[in-house]
């Protein structure tokens, strides 16, 4: 993917694979504004995740229709994230899927 958004999406896919998560392209025919990807996995606490991820190019925000659809999905119990940088994707995976590190930088075992 040559576009900046594509680079962000590629990073999401790589991080999902590295963290033993599924990362599916999400399309919903006749429904514009839905998130780009679904990440499915079990986090470092044993909690099952099915997260909808909207990837954007750095500095871009979701369009009005996307914001409306994301809000509607959240109102129905879905978890929706908008991630626009590689750093935001890294934070998402650190928060949920990557093992904690101690003060010395060593991974704390599960």
Predicted regions, residues:
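Catalytic phosphate/metal-binding cores of nucleic-acid and nucleotide-processing enzymes, i.e., regions
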Residues: 1-110
